[in-house]
Regions:
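Charge-rich amphipathic alpha-helical interaction elements
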Residues: 1-114
């Protein structure tokens, strides 16, 4: 492999290493928001009950319609988008490394055949 090709592989490895913390944080944020969404719904349903909505269906409707719940959903959307963006960048870097491994293996086999 050319020196430039090897440099690209090290860049891919460095990318994975350098972005692992950001990916972990994005994933943690997404998981937190998924669970917080449930807590927020419960809190909003309780507030709806106190406001006089006695059935669970009415409480749920009020919770889903609440602007605070919608804000949680928007934050979850952003968190999922960031997590997926980082994940696919990681997958691309891993694929570059796998291609390099395959090419290097083929190169070694060719050398043995000569």
């Amino acid at each position: 492999m050319t020196e430039e090709g090897e440099i690209q592989i090290f860049r891919a490895l460095n990318f994975i290493r350098d972005n692992a913390p950001a990916y972990a944080k994005a994933k943690a944020e997404r998981i937190y928001l998924e669970n917080f969404r449930k807590s927020k719904k419960a809190l909003l349903m309780r507030a709806a009950e106190i406001a006089g909505h006695k059935s669970a269906a009415l409480q749920e409707r009020e919770a889903y319609a609440n602007a605070e719940y919608v804000d949680v959903l928007k934050a979850l959307q952003v968190a999922v988008e960031e997590e997926e963006r980082l994940r696919w960048l990681m997958v691309a870097a891993e694929a570059r490394i796998e291609v390099w491994r395959t090419l290097e293996s083929s190169r070694r086999i060719e050398k043995k055949m000569i």
